[in-house]
């Protein structure tokens, strides 16, 4: 999964959202009260808020999930997007931007530390229709900078480009959290001109990926996705940051500094080191250990010394 950090994402426990001004907060309260909302930091499910009986943009809500009335067929290609959650306003999913964050259902990888493991299954139906996103954006001009697609892994859905195009046509920029599972699809989307920014998770060195994500050949795909983004920089491709999430006593921690060093040598300008968190993860997973915080601070200092244009340490 991709939600900043992880992946419902990538890439992202409850992360406090920065307070908005009164005019923004008042305008968004109605959406937050009636919608299925998944909070995130880089892709981690922070909380689920389900309203009672309400109606959002003509879409009926019953029992806490939003469904099209009378099983009406999709009216546009983007209506096929399977959405597990929507945050009407986020300050943490795209650095320096105020965005709406869309959590897509399904991820082909199975990271053991995933904070959004409920979004890994690929056959679950969505709970938020694209019509609700469309209606939200119609009222948020001047209040939001853009929309971030996270997951799960948003690139696994064929209609992602259609949804991104609608966002751009509505006057907003598009951000993406990805674990790099689909380098060819990422290349196509980067070349389309629809993407403004990508948060790419590089979880480990290529040879150690199967131990992290539970899938063979996964490391090659993720590092190929990094090459895709680097190659796009000279031809109008999206800005991007690489994020590595670390777990105590694990290969992710052992690899982190070397991952950062290789990224810097390849020309990556923005890098983030993220501590995994126990909140929202599978039962039995723990992201704490004696001396772990101090170890992460030492890793952060080593990575910062590599000279990235922008480096951020994101503690748990």
Predicted features, each with a name:
Residues 1-7, 13, 29, 33-35, ...:
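Auxiliary Fe-S-binding modules of radical SAM enzymes
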Residues 75, 92-128:
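Canonical Radical SAM [4Fe-4S] cluster-binding loop centered on the CxxxCxxC motif
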Residues 103, 150-151:
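A secondary-structure boundary/capping signal
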Residues 117-147:
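Conserved alpha-helical substructure of the radical SAM core
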Residues 123-126, 152-153, 175-176:
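Short, flexible loop segments at the rims of nucleotide/cofactor-binding pockets, characterized by
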């Amino acid at each position: 999964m991709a939600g900043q950090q992880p992946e419902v994402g990538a890439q992202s426990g409850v992360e406090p959202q920065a307070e908005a001004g009164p005019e923004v907060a008042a305008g968004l309260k109605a959406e937050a009260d009636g919608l299925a909302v998944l909070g995130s930091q880089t892709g981690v499910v922070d909380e689920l808020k389900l309203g009672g009986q309400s109606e959002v943009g003509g879409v009926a809500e019953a029992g806490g999930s939003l469904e099209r009335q009378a099983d009406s067929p999709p009216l546009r290609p983007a209506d096929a997007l399977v959405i597990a959650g929507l945050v009407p306003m986020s300050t943490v999913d795209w650095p320096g931007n105020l965005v709406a964050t869309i959590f897509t259902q399904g991820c082909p990888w199975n990271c053991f530390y995933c904070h959004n493991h409920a979004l890994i299954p690929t056959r679950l139906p969505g709970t938020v229709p694209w019509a609700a996103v469309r209606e939200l954006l119609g009222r948020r001009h001047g209040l939001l900078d853009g929309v971030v697609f996270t997951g799960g892994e948003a690139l696994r859905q064929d209609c992602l480009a259609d949804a991104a195009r609608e966002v751009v046509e509505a006057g907003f920029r598009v951000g993406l959290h990805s674990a790099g599972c689909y380098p060819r699809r990422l290349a196509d989307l980067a070349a389309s001109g629809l993407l403004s920014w990508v948060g790419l998770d590089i979880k480990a060195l290529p040879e150690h990926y199967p131990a992290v994500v539970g899938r063979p050949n996964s490391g090659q795909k993720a590092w190929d996705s990094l090459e895709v983004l680097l190659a796009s920089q000279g031809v109008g491709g999206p800005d991007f940051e690489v994020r590595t999430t670390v777990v105590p006593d694990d290969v992710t921690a052992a690899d982190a500094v070397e991952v950062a060093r290789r990224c810097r040598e390849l020309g990556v300008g923005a890098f983030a080191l993220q501590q995994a968190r126990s909140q929202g993860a599978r039962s039995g997973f723990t992201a704490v250990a004696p001396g772990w915080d101090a170890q992460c601070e030492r890793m952060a200092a080593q990575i910062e010394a590599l000279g990235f244009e922008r480096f951020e340490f994101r503690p748990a």
